[in-house]
């Protein structure tokens, strides 16, 4: 039996592997990630609560493919050009500031006056009746401001989290520190999801705020409809400003001493070698290693998109109005945050003790098990119902889907993100910076958009199709892509080991 002092040191090493001298850098980085993930959790629920109750869960496939993906491509081109001309710090302020400005404009100007900007329902219904195969595109046009909010909310994840924050972290930490810092950063940051869920539940369940349905219900006044949205957006903007303030503190006061692993002079010399846009794209395409990282992201995005569509359709059946939808998603965020923090504690030890390969494989394994269970439940829901009697099968289906979503995303945030970020570290600064820009933004959205393409193509060809009617085909695609993901991880691990040596 270990002496008490050694035992507690071992426990501390498992739960909190950060040394005291590193707290000066760790604390502001963790708080910055908490603010960014708070916004992610809140925006994720808001974007779904706007589009799903008003246009249907099937519309998500069209939004991801026809709007989100092109927006990501345009942003990547813009980012590569900016990275050749501006300091990373100014790029960060410009991008985050643009997001926050749009959210304010939407909540306080666009949304309250949506009746002025949106076409009337009679005209939309006539267009759908005349062009049934284009009904989903017509629905997007009818609520174009919701679609725009959806795009910006999606880009917050791809741009601010995956690209801006993690690129900054990769510049600061080497591989050894990343193994200790990244899981704990994620653990602290995911508390933001719990806070976001609590905020959403508070503003969607308080009867003193509003007594009836809000946001997307046209028979409510615009002022009442905005009562829930505006304070949430205000908190989101405040969190974004705090994140920028912390970013400034880190750059100005902390990265000037020995804690900064990055050699500033060396970086300045390297970044003088600029590539033209076409050359940058060629560099990314011809890098087999970057291609494998991109495939990781594509597989995850496609698989989670395939599962989320049917799940959100079931949520709409149970919660057809936006208040209940936001309230459910708020509770979902709380449990997601709790699960993520738990997985972060476990994941930090898996990564340090079992290595990169095992840590990277656990996410697809978790997603395959929980995803397969969800599909089987939906496909055989009637047969299952005969065994369990008078249970509310719709509610059970949603809970099964929620468990799948929570567990798979918890393993993704704790292990997938950390192992993916570690895979960038052995690369040169040029390839790491510009390769990551394309992989993170385009790769993230291409995976989801590929799943969206498959689904939207079916919905265009067969306007009467629903997620329930195509669920068996989605299961087949799910199994094929899961095997490809696992094979790619094994191949990437071999190249990662070579680069680290």
Swiss-Prot record:
Regions crossing the membrane: 23-43, 59-79, 90-110, 146-166, 183-203, 227-247, 293-313, 326-346, 361-381, 383-403, 446-466, 470-490
Alphabetic keyword roster: ATP-binding, Cell membrane, Membrane, Nucleotide-binding, Transmembrane, Transmembrane helix, Transport
Pfam families membership: TLC (PF03219)
Major place of residence: membrane
Annotated GO MF terms: ATP binding; ATP:ADP antiporter activity
Stored NCBIfam families: AAA (TIGR00769)
Function: Provides the rickettsial cell with host ATP in exchange for rickettsial ADP. This is an obligate exchange system. This energy acquiring activity is an important component of rickettsial parasitism.
Name under which the protein is recorded: ADP,ATP carrier protein 3
Gene (name only): tlcC
């Amino acid at each position: 039996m270990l002496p008490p002092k050694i035992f507690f040191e071992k426990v501390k090493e498992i739960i909190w592997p950060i040394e005291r001298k590193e707290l000066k850098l760790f604390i502001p980085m963790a708080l910055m990630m908490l603010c960014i993930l708070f916004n992610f959790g809140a925006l994720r629920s808001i974007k779904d609560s706007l589009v799903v109750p008003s246009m249907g869960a099937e519309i998500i496939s069209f939004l991801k493919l026809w709007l989100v993906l092109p927006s990501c491509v345009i942003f990547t081109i813009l980012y590569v050009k900016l990275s050749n001309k501006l300091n990373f710090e100014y790029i960060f302020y410009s991008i985050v500031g643009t997001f926050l400005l749009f959210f304010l404009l939407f909540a306080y100007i666009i949304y309250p006056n949506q009746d002025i900007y949106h076409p009337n329902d009679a005209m939309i219904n006539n267009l759908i009746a005349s062009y049934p195969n284009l009904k989903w595109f017509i629905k997007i046009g009818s609520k174009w401001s919701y679609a725009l909010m959806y795009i910006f909310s999606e880009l917050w994840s791809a741009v601010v989290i995956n690209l801006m924050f993690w690129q900054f972290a990769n510049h600061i930490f080497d591989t050894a520190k990343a193994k200790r810092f990244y899981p704990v950063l994620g653990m602290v940051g995911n508390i933001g999801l719990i806070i976001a869920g609590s905020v959403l539940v508070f503003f969607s369940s308080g009867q003193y705020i509003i007594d009836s349905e809000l946001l997307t219900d046209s028979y409510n006044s615009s002022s009442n409809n905005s009562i829930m949205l505006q304070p949430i957006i205000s908190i989101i903007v405040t969190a974004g400003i705090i994140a920028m303030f912390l970013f400034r503190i880190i750059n100005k006061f902390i990265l000037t001493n020995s804690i900064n692993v990055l050699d500033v002079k060396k970086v300045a010399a390297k970044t003088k070698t600029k590539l033209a846009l076409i050359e940058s794209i060629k560099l990314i395409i011809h890098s087999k290693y970057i291609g494998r990282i991109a495939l990781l992201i594509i597989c995850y995005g496609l698989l989670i998109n395939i599962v989320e569509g049917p799940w959100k359709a079931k949520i709409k059946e149970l919660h057809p109005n936006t208040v209940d939808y936001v309230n459910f998603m708020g509770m979902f965020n709380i449990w997601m945050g709790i699960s993520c923090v738990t997985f972060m504690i476990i994941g930090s030890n898996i990564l340090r003790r079992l290595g990169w390969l095992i840590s990277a494989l656990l996410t697809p394994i978790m997603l395959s098990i929980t995803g397969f269970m969800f599909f089987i439940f939906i496909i055989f829901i009637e047969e299952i119902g005969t065994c369990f009697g008078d249970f509310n099968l719709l509610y059970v289906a949603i809970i099964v889907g929620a468990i799948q979503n929570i567990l798979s995303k918890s393993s993704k945030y704790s292990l997938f993100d950390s192992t993916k970020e570690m895979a960038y570290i052995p690369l040169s600064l040029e390839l790491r910076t510009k390769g990551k820009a394309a992989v993170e933004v385009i790769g993230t959205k291409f995976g989801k958009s590929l799943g969206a393409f498959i689904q939207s193509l079916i919905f265009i060809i067969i306007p009467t199709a629903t997620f329930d009617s195509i669920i068996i085909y989605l299961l087949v695609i799910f199994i094929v892509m899961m095997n490809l993901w696992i094979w790619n991880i094994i191949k990437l691990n071999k190249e990662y080991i070579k680069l680290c040596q």
